[in-house]
Amino acid sequence: MNITVLAVGTKMPRWVDEAVAEYAKRFGRDVAYALKEIKPEKRGAGVNAAQGMAAEEKRILEAIPQGAFLVVLDERGKAPTSVELAEHLKSWRQNGEHVCFVIGGADGMTDRLKQQARMMMRLSSLTLPHGMVRVFLTEQLYRAVSILHNHPYHRE
């Protein structure tokens, strides 16, 4: 199964990169996992949030793998349980889907990008730092895979 995470933002703290790498290597051969950073648009004089999100949208759309099942992370999305996420992964794998998760920038993402998604998912009702979202999402994806393999990592 192929999973791509597109995350707006670069230059994360070392602990973020290390944590994501740790969970990514745990997937093993069953999952081809890739995290791709999308350059954020600089904010400041003459660039408002809407313009910034539009520029980031263009970069995101260019980075989405051809034919991927698009899942955007958004505070208005559905928050699945770990078991429900595992069921989604199982279905996507059975359908041969390449799944692409998108983590928006500091101002979020455009409505147009959200409308193109086949699923909107919320990780938490809390506001989380972008680096933490990368770690949290990757860990939950690993947890979902471990559930599908009856691995003892996840306990009910």
UniProtKB/Swiss-Prot annotation:
InterPro entries: Alpha/beta_knot_MTases, RlmH-like, tRNA_m1G_MTases_N. It comes from the Bacteria. GO terms for molecular function: rRNA (pseudouridine-N3-)-methyltransferase activity. It is an enzyme of class 2 (transferase). It is found in: Cytoplasm. GO terms for cellular component: cytoplasm. Its EC number is 2.1.1.177. S-adenosyl-L-methionine binds at L73, G104, L123, S124, S125, L126, T127, L128. It catalyses: pseudouridine(1915) in 23S rRNA + S-adenosyl-L-methionine = N(3)-methylpseudouridine(1915) in 23S rRNA + S-adenosyl-L-homocysteine + H(+). Homodimer. Belongs to the RNA methyltransferase RlmH family. HAMAP family: 23SrRNA_methyltr_H. Specifically methylates the pseudouridine at position 1915 (m3Psi1915) in 23S rRNA. This is Ribosomal RNA large subunit methyltransferase H. The gene is rlmH.
